[in-house]
Amino acid sequence: MFDVDGVRYYADASGIRQTGWVKVSGTWYYLDPSSGVMRTGWVSVGGSWYYLDPSTGAMQTGWLQESGDWYYLKSSGAMVSNASVKVSDGTYWYMNGSGRHDKQAGIDIIMRTARSLLGVPYVWLGVYPQDGGMDCASFTWYLYKQLGIDIGFETYDQMYSGVRVFGDPQPGDIILMYYGAWPNYNPMLPEHVVLYAGGGMIYEEPTFGGRCQYVSLASKGASTTTAQRILS
């Protein structure tokens, strides 16, 4: 690296000024393809956004907080957008189209998808709407699949997704249901799962002969419920 009038460049061992990506002592830098000037801050390259340290120009990876917003940069340095990243507590952060952590944007996608599926028949072991129908667990799996999150096809997989909710559920939480009174039920085998929509309402694929519906949680008559939070 060398500076000219306060601007940084990089030349190879032959003294030839470089452009584009260069790796120096294990660190990546980006040099303007026209001028060779070392770039800093946000830069778009090949359809992806990267963040280069404002002081050193070093390409950043992992979590980045800027102006109060959180971003996630893959090991390649590329910013994650319109996708989810698993965080340390087992939940996921949804990164919106601008790359910012935006839980509400993720919830909105899930709710829009759920509304679009109203009336789809219940089909045991059905996976996708185009298969002719879905069951309760593939319904909630499909909703979270829209965010790039795999919570599993079965209720006994989904009971371990995200974190257990102690207290009132929030929109986007999944609620697992048991119908036998204690001790006549197996807490490891939930009998039903639904999406909590807020205000005491849920979206669900109900049971044989039913169709995807928007109903009250209370109407389900479950003896025991637990909730899991996937998005945070």
Language-model segments: residues:
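Short loop segments at secondary-structure junctions
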Residues: 34, 55, 76, 180-181, ...
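Glycine-rich nucleotide phosphate-binding loop and flanking beta-alpha elements
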Residues: 17, 101, 182-183, 209
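Catalytic cysteine-centered active-site loop
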Residues: 116-171, 176-178, 182, 222-225
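Short histidine-centered beta-strand/loop micro-motifs
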Residues: 62, 185-188
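Aromatic- and glycine-rich peptidoglycan recognition patches
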Residues: 40, 105-113, 156, 163-166, ...
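Extracellular adhesion/carbohydrate-binding repeat motifs centered on closely spaced tryptophans
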Residues: 1-108
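Exposed loop/turn and edge beta-strand positions of beta-sandwich/beta-sheet ligand-binding modules
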Residues: 89, 130, 190
